[in-house]
């Protein structure tokens, strides 16, 4: 078991040494972190258009997650204060109750060929269904390398929606996210589908609603870890369950509820070089599958067992290969810190982080209030914006916390007073 005692109170250099002592990174990985070695400008210029430079974000670590019995140190990239601290807090508390359990329901991507001007949709649908095996073979022939790796096209079906006959294709992309793979296969099917349907192909494109790549994370938290006061612990558990119910019935709350989940998910997706926009799009669409936006997680209080049960399910078509994953040295460090998991394991970890983030947010909301934990972080941000040096931040923060409410103007005044007194 890796112990990173005092990690949150250490300096960045001390944290890196703790990683070295724990054997979590190779010497090359340690050097990458020490040198703050990120994406070279020359490489960035080859990745996107009209490059001017690169934009850095804080790269942190949430230690002590236990997922399916394995201890995981989770890299997170985010500019938002409190996200990493909240994830770490929740991970530690949930680990004491047995950690997170996860389930990968399936891992396949879905794409579609939309057909229009189909005069006889039922007849066309039947013709496509009868040609299913031949169409799957054509799809695999369009991308033979994935078949060699054990993946490839798995299923094909049609649905009539409005004026469209839509042909869906599901593909096992193995360790890749599979966008290019799927699009190549789909485009290879357009001509034969037009012939079979006697219609026109409108578009062939993957879908970011990856309902064939659902992952569930769950946890059970003993009431005694919610508060030392048994009555207060039971009240917190009940309020967290009520907060979950609120997100299920009110889309205004659901949007913020789910945004909090993605505070954690996006941070890990970004750290591991994955497409956070695709994950967000799929997650938020999945949350609205009933016709109304709802919370992605659910929490149930069990007073008889003195246990709070949490669960989160969402599409997680994450990758460990392909795209820009191998280009950024910091991304490789993130994968190393995680133990270089395969795509399914990485998906399990990410959904567990989302559930941890959700628990931390809900517990704060129904007990101390969200601003209580944010005050010190807000004061620190104001101190930095006011121009405080690293040695000046702590006294400015202390002065602001002792004189609420505070703002940037007050932070500047406090900083000026500190400098004059020195």
Residue ranges, per PLM feature:
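Alpha/propeptide regions of enzymes that mature by internal proteolysis
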Residues: 1-45, 50-51, 88, 92, ...
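Flexible, glycine/charged-enriched surface loops at secondary-structure junctions
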Residues: 33, 99-105, 142-155, 196-208, ...
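Small-residue-rich
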Residues: 44-49, 53-162, 166-170
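Acidic/polar, glycine-rich intrinsically disordered N-terminal extensions of enzymes
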Residues: 1-72, 76, 80, 100, ...
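Catalytic-core signal marking the mid-to-C-terminal active-site face
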Residues: 308, 315-422
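A structural-propensity feature for long, helix-poor, extended segments
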Residues: 97-129, 287-351, 357
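Glycine-rich anion/phosphate-binding loop at the beta-strand->alpha-helix junction
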Residues: 175-177, 182-330
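Conserved phosphate/anionic-ligand binding catalytic regions in large, soluble enzymes, centered on
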Residues: 58-83, 174-182, 248-273, 354-363, ...
């Amino acid at each position: 078991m890796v112990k990173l005692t005092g990690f949150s109170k250490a300096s960045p250099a001390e944290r890196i040494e703790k990683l070295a002592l724990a054997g979590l990174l190779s010497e090359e990985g340690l050097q990458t972190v020490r040198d703050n070695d990120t994406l070279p400008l020359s490489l960035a210029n080859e990745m996107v258009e009209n490059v001017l430079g690169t934009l850095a974000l804080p790269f942190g670590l949430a230690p002590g997650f236990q997922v399916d019995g394995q201890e995981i140190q989770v890299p997170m990239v985010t500019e938002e204060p409190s996200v990493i601290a909240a994830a770490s807090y929740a991970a530690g508390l949930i680990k004491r109750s047995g950690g997170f359990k996860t389930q990968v329901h399936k891992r396949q991507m879905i794409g579609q060929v939309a057909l229009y001007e189909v005069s006889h949709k039922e007849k066309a649908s039947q013709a496509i269904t009868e040609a299913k095996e031949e169409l799957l073979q054509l799809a695999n022939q369009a991308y033979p390398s994935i078949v060699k790796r054990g993946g490839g096209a798995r299923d094909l079906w049609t649905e009539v929606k409005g004026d469209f006959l839509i042909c869906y294709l599901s593909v096992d992309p193995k360790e890749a996210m599979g966008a290019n793979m799927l699009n190549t296969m789909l485009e290879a099917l357009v001509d034969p589908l037009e012939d079979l349907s006697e219609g026109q192909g409108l578009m062939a494109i993957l879908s970011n609603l990856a309902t064939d790549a659902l992952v569930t994370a769950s946890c059970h938290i003993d009431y005694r870890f919610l508060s030392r006061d048994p009555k207060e612990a039971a009240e917190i558990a009940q309020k967290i369950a009520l907060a979950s119910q609120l997100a299920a019935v009110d889309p205004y709350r659901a949007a913020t509820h789910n945004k909090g989940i993605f505070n954690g998910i996006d941070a890990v997706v970004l750290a591991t070089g994955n497409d956070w926009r695709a994950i967000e799009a799929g997650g938020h669409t999945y949350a609205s599958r009933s016709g109304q936006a709802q919370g992605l997680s659910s929490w149930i209080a069990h007073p008889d067992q003195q246990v709070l049960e949490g669960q989160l399910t969402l599409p997680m078509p994450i990758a460990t290969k392909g795209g820009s994953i191998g280009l950024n040295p910091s991304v490789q460090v993130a994968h190393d810190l995680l133990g270089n998991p395969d795509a399914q394991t990485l998906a399990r970890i990410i959904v567990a982080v989302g559930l941890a983030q959700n628990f931390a947010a809900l517990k704060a909301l129904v007990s101390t209030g969200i601003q209580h934990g944010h005050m010190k972080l807000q004061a620190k941000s104001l101190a930095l914006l006011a121009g405080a040096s690293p040695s000046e931040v702590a006294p400015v923060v202390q002065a602001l916390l002792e004189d609420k409410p505070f703002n940037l103007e007050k932070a500047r005044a406090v900083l000026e007073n500190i400098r004059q007194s020195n």
